[in-house]
Swiss-Prot record:
It comes from Alkalilimnicola ehrlichii (strain ATCC BAA-1101 / DSM 17681 / MLHE-1). GO terms for cellular component: cytosolic large ribosomal subunit. Gene3D superfamilies: 1.10.287.310. The keyword Ribonucleoprotein applies. Belongs to the universal ribosomal protein uL29 family. It holds the Pfam family Ribosomal_L29. Keywords: Ribonucleoprotein, Ribosomal protein. The lineage of its organism: Bacteria, Pseudomonadati, Pseudomonadota, Gammaproteobacteria, Chromatiales. GO terms for molecular function: structural constituent of ribosome. This is Large ribosomal subunit protein uL29. It comes from the Bacteria. The keyword Ribonucleoprotein applies. One of its GO terms (biological process) is translation. InterPro entries: Ribosomal_protein_uL29 (IPR050063), Ribosomal_uL29 (IPR001854), Ribosomal_uL29_sf (IPR036049).
Amino acid sequence: MKASELREKDVTALQAELGERLKERFNLRIQQATGQLARPDQLRKVRRDIARVKTVLNEKTAGKA
């Protein structure tokens, strides 16, 4: 997901997106721990998506404060 796509969303949509990504990361970490993770690069991709969402969320909340 691109940051430009995230900037078009509102704060509630970004928070929902963050929740989804955190759940996805949790599931991938469980798969990794049990040796079932077929593509380890997915974990890195989700981690970076979480960072992008958090960055855009902080930009939006800092703009309102």
